[in-house]
Amino acid sequence: MNVQIEESWKQHLAPEFEKDYFIRLTEFVRSEYQTATIYPPGRFIFNAFNLCPFDKVKVVIIGQDPYHGPGQAHGLCFSVNDGVPFPPSLQNIFKEIQSDLGAPIPTSGNLTRWANQGVLLLNATLTVRAHQAGSHQRRGWEEFTDAAIRVLAEQRENIVFILWGSYAQKKGAFIDRNKHLVLASAHPSPLSAYNGFFGNKHFSRTNEYLQAHGQTPIEW
């Protein structure tokens, strides 16, 4: 199957594209786009991969589901398009960056600038029906994104994996802590941010680790 995804990822994930689950997933997603309003727009489904080639990945942040409101999702977890109000979790992420690094709250919630520096902003599920959170879960996306995380964890070294909340922590449970830095805390959602997300200093800790391993820090 010829999947429109960045070339290095296409090579590393090629076995997945031929598996039965992925063929079924593709048929389901194609049908959904034809019959319902689906986010993100089709050209952005693999945006996280397209902006961040396999060998350029320094950091992986694992999200769960795309935003399901109009104009928000563009294929990067937690990120929104320019001009879109910050969802609460993103607002809290920026607050933690401000507290941790002293950086001002940005004017845009578009995290393409992180992706361009090697931050893979990967949702576990890559599509969703408008206004129906979780509507495309358990259709095969989770298996596909597990494969992407696994191939990174096995074939690369010294990546920072950031796991916020129990869902992301379960998804990243297999990552070898001797080869990579795994940072885990509560989720930035208002429901849990005060239970260990605020004050986790994940952004400074990421940069310290990258610099210790000869890599350029991220401009958060």
Swiss-Prot record:
Active site annotation, chain numbering: 65
Domain of life: Bacteria
Principal localisation: cytoplasm
Role noted for this protein: Excises uracil residues from the DNA which can arise as a result of misincorporation of dUMP residues by DNA polymerase or due to deamination of cytosine.
Top-level enzyme category: hydrolase
Name recorded for this polypeptide: Uracil-DNA glycosylase
Localization per Swiss-Prot or TrEMBL: Cytoplasm
Similarity comment: Belongs to the uracil-DNA glycosylase (UDG) superfamily. UNG family.
Entry annotated with the keyword Chaperone: no
One GO process term, biological-process aspect: base-excision repair, AP site formation via deaminated base removal
One term of GO molecular function: uracil DNA N-glycosylase activity
Gene label: ung
GO terms under cellular component: cytoplasm
Keyword set, alphabetical order: Cytoplasm, DNA damage, DNA repair, Hydrolase
Organism: Phocaeicola vulgatus (strain ATCC 8482 / DSM 1447 / JCM 5826 / CCUG 4940 / NBRC 14291 / NCTC 11154) (Bacteroides vulgatus)
SUPFAM superfamilies in the record: Uracil-DNA glycosylase-like
Catalytic activity: Hydrolyzes single-stranded DNA or mismatched double-stranded DNA and polynucleotides, releasing free uracil
PROSITE patterns, per database record: U_DNA_GLYCOSYLASE
SMART domains xref list: UDG, UreE_C
Listed EC numbers: 3.2.2.27
